[in-house]
A protein has these predicted regions:
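Residue-level signal for inorganic ion chemistry
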Residues: 15, 19, 41, 52, ...
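An extended, acidic
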Residues: 138-257
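DPxDG-like acidic metal-binding loop motif
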Residues: 72-131
Length: 257
């Protein structure tokens, strides 16, 4: 599969004006409990799917917005979240991003996460390392959970599991130096990938939430698994446990209690 990743990143950067269009950010459709989509989401997805399909017509699409259909995972798939952090966007809380990953039929090989509010571009190609604004970055080297900053996520869509979710988060909070949450899983995962944080946990994420960031973290030297320590398949929802590698087993053991 021959993909010009530099040109793909340029397409993602072109989404800046679409995301910063405040008028479209307030054209809101309610999909479910605390689950929103704005005209920005539709505009970004329409632009990227159109541009990528023109250049790579044989690559399939999995996107947050739009019709879901059966995919052939033995073939390449773009995995797109046009706006990760839609609720943030609606509230003008400036932690939202475009997240684009590529599955080559066997594994995730490319990830790009772009936050236009802070002009931060994370990108990684398998075997080539991870870059933040074209500067190579790696995960931290903190050796213990007690000295680590942990990113956590909570879903507003299923508050019936709040006690179960927050029990796990409480364990991490007590055992670590502290916890943080931005409201965007992709941004939180990239915060780990560039060494600003040391671990990440969220109970239930969809493929477009995490696909790009898995490449960004692993190419930066980190580890990403489910709660059982197993590899992630990007065709399904999953709990995500990610770390700098040093504290991974400690996190898994704590979450399993």
């Amino acid at each position: 599969m021959n993909v010009d990743y530099k040109s793909v990143v340029e397409l993602v950067l072109n989404c800046k004006s679409l995301i910063l269009n405040n008028d479209k950010a307030h054209q809101i459709t309610v999909k479910g409990l605390a689950d929103y989509v704005t005209q920005v989401d539709f505009s970004v997805q329409s632009y990227l799917t159109g541009a990528l399909a023109e250049r790579y017509p044989d690559i399939q699409f999995l996107g947050e917005e739009g019709q879901k259909h059966t995919l052939d995972w033995s073939r390449p798939v773009w995995i797109l979240d046009p706006v990760d952090g839609t609720t943030n966007l609606i509230h003008d809380f400036q932690e939202s991003c475009v997240s684009l990953g590529l599955w080559d039929g066997h594994e995730l090989v490319f990830g790009c996460v772009y936050n236009p509010f802070h002009e931060e571009l994370f990108e990684a190609v398998k075997g080539r390392g991870t870059y933040l604004n074209h500067r190579r970055v790696t995960v931290s080297d903190r050796p213990t959970l007690a000295k680590s900053l942990i990113m956590v996520g909570t879903s507003p869509y299923d508050k019936g599991r709040a006690d179960q979710v927050f029990d796990k988060i409480k364990r991490l909070y007590v055992a670590s130096e502290d916890i943080r949450r931005s409201g965007s899983a992709a941004i939180d995962l990239c915060t780990l990938g560039c060494g600003r944080a040391d671990g990440f946990f969220e109970y239930d994420l969809k493929p477009w939430d995490y696909a790009a960031s898995i490449v960004i973290i692993t190419e930066a030297g980190g580890t990403v698994t489910n709660e059982k320590g197993e590899p992630i398949f990007p065709g399904e929802r999953s709990a995500i446990v990610a770390s700098n590698g040093h504290i991974h087993q400690e996190m898994l053991d704590l979450l399993a209690k």
